Amino acid sequence: MGIDRFIGIDLAWAQSGARTKPNESGVAAIDGHGVVIECGWTRGLDETMSWLAKTAVDGSTLAFVDAPLVVDNPVGQRPCEREVGQRYGRWKVSANSTNQSSPRQAGVLLRERLQESGWAYDDGRGGPPTGGLVFSECYPYTTLVGAAELGYDQERPTYKRRPARVPTARWRAVRAAECARMIGRMEGLTTADPPLLLSSHPGSRQLVSEPSPQKAADYKHLEDLIDALLCAWTAALWSRHGLARCQVLGADSSLPPGQAPTIIAPARPEQRRDRGAR
């Protein structure tokens, strides 16, 4: 047995209203050789579930989702989110707080839909799965600074949030340039273990061949696809190397195996708890 397909979903966290068009979610699927099988966008949970049904390999798929999947805390921040800041704060990476009062619960709804469809949520505390239809939570920022292959040794790339040092008037141009550099680093994963071959699919190839847009809506469109590809590659990294290259944030939960709210995150030695990262 083994996992043959790795899926990444950059999920739009908020639910759409009756009169509101759902926001886009980025979706991507790669195989064990890094070939991009499919990538693009969906709108709403129904489209995302339909895409998964067409893209997953039955009995051999691992999906990583960038969205809170298990939210059991009435207030405050989930422990796994707190640990993001504790372990990766030096690289200027932190996580938004999620609790049962948060309006953005699309990840919880996706988990419920997936479980109803035969998928199994895996909190990662038992190591990588060896088969089945399995999904877990990840956070692309931890991949960017936790995977040494990408070269972000000092701090995260500024492709999302404007740093205070960048004037608002210059932000769109600075962001587009930073995004282009990040795509260049992702293109370098061709020789990584596991690899990611951006040139293997027209959608991901376009990231490399065309300049990053400055217009806000166009940029968000591209950003969602980038994050989905990072999620898929993180799933492949976890499957290939397990705890040797990744850590499970929130692993101290007292919940039964497979039920804890966790984030599976690539980690350098200095980002791990047992190396003084707290």
Region locations from a protein language model:
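RNase H-like (RuvC/DEDD) metal-dependent nuclease/polynucleotide-processing core
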Residues: 1-7, 11-278
